């Protein structure tokens, strides 16, 4: 019986550090952000759906999605925002489901990294949910270093997300990513041993 583990956490919580480590250990990881990127690439299903809806004005000269223009159009009205969410979420969910079902045929244990796993009701897909937990101070520090955000921008990004405490209710396992990378890897190793022995 395949075990499917969902990985989630707030922005700059260190999900990619953990998923890269899982890949190094030989596990398959479906990355929702990468799936979205693939779908939005020229000719992808999301690309086609957005062009059909909003027209070629959302494309740049190379024929790729002009993300600033797209954001401007989507966020210009509540109706556009609602339609965009509905359209994109349906296509993304279908693609994630297809990839999940493919891996379930060949893998004993695999992982899916979905940043909005809890908020967008993916919970029933998983045997377990791992929440990557870090302090808001750590997230802000990483956002400033990694994304070049100001203190205010970083705080705004955090404020727009579901709080960690609210997410903890849905988590089966919590990986504390406040300390060193080595410490985090030790926690992951411990969880992997437990999964393999069950």
From Swiss-Prot:
Disulfide bonds: none annotated. The keyword tRNA processing does not apply. GO terms for cellular component: cytoplasm. Residues 4-198 form the DPCK domain. Keywords: ATP-binding, Coenzyme A biosynthesis, Cytoplasm, Kinase, Nucleotide-binding, Transferase. SUPFAM superfamilies: P-loop containing nucleoside triphosphate hydrolases. It is an enzyme of class 2 (transferase). Pathway: Cofactor biosynthesis; coenzyme A biosynthesis; CoA from (R)-pantothenate: step 5/5. ATP binds at residues 12-17. Its EC number is 2.7.1.24. It catalyses: 3'-dephospho-CoA + ATP = ADP + CoA + H(+). One of its GO terms (molecular function) is dephospho-CoA kinase activity. CDD domains: DPCK. GO terms for biological process: coenzyme A biosynthetic process. It holds the Pfam family CoaE. It comes from the Bacteria. It is found in: Cytoplasm. Catalyzes the phosphorylation of the 3'-hydroxyl group of dephosphocoenzyme A to form coenzyme A. NCBIfam families: dephospho-CoA kinase. Belongs to the CoaE family. This is Dephospho-CoA kinase. It comes from Streptococcus mutans serotype c (strain ATCC 700610 / UA159). The gene is coaE.
